[in-house]
């Protein structure tokens, strides 16, 4: 299934439109297959022959795409990646976890079970800590860089 077609369908299901510029940003993000900053993404879009786009527009588009669950923002690096589940035909109720390689910066999105998240919440609650963001980002070394 084509990722962009799936994204268009998800947007349509939510009553919003994946405009030409939104498509361009999402396509660039999917094709680069890496976590990139909004400024890096702006450069990618502008280098690929798309209509020149200012960084502020890319930020607004990324905000829209994140709201549609088509991209994720990595809090620790302030970079964005395309959701690996865009083309899935089923719902994902689990919270994604991101494995970030310290060497090559590759990011792999994996699901975390509700049991794992509950265990983390319990540990936090035991020390009086309230989780405000349940997105997990773990850094290490990927299998290619070992």
Task: Give the label of every model feature segment.
Residues 1-26:
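Short alpha-helical segments that sit at the start of domains
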Residues 29-31, 43:
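Short, contiguous, helix-prone interaction/anchoring segments in small proteins
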């Amino acid at each position: 299934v084509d990722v962009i077609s799936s994204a268009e369908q998800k947007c349509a299901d939510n009553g919003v439109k994946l405009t030409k510029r939104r498509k361009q940003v999402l396509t660039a993000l999917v094709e680069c297959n890496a976590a990139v900053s909004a400024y890096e993404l702006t450069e990618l879009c502008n280098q690929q022959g798309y209509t020149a786009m200012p960084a502020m527009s890319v930020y607004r588009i990324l905000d829209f795409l994140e709201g549609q669950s088509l991209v994720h923002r990595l809090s620790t690096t302030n970079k964005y990646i395309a959701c690996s589940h865009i083309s899935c035909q089923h719902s994902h109720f689990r919270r994604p976890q991101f494995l970030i390689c310290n060497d090559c910066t590759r990011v792999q999105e994996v699901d975390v079970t509700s049991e794992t998240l509950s265990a983390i919440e319990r540990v936090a609650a035991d020390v009086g800590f309230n989780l405000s963001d349940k997105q997990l980002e773990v850094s290490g070394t990927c299998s290619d860089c070992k």
